[in-house]
From Swiss-Prot:
Species this protein is from: Mus musculus (Mouse)
Stretches the record annotates as TMD: 83-103
In-chain residues carrying the UniProt-annotated modification N-acetylalanine: A2
Protein known as: Mitochondrial import receptor subunit TOM22 homolog
GO biological process: protein insertion into mitochondrial outer membrane; protein targeting to mitochondrion
Amino acid sequence: MAAAVAAAGAGEPLSPEELLPKAEAEKAEEELEEDDDDELDETLSERLWGLTEMFPERVRSAAGATFDLSLFVAQKMYRFSRAALWIGTTSFMILVLPVVFETEKLQMEQQQQLQQRQILLGPNTGLSGGMPGALPPLPGKM
């Protein structure tokens, strides 16, 4: 105890062990441990149910209605997005993909014709000679 008084005079803060006698400090620790054990017996659902009791019935019912409405809206949006995605995907496959395949096929045919012209007539004629609307090759350069 004399050490505690001397430490207090020096301006240092006292620890709980220095303030309480040793027997009382041990009892305080045991009581804290017992309090913790009592709190651990309670489940999470029991704690949440207990927390709801601190709000008035009006607030609880409003929160419940808001949650139900949010759940309903989320379900409706999910169903709508599924239907919209299905309609969009099938429409794209039926309407757009055939056009894409035909344009790709046409480009491949044009590329093959260009390659055949280059093979038969030479490298310079494949680019300028066979294309309609293109300028004729210059007479001095061959």
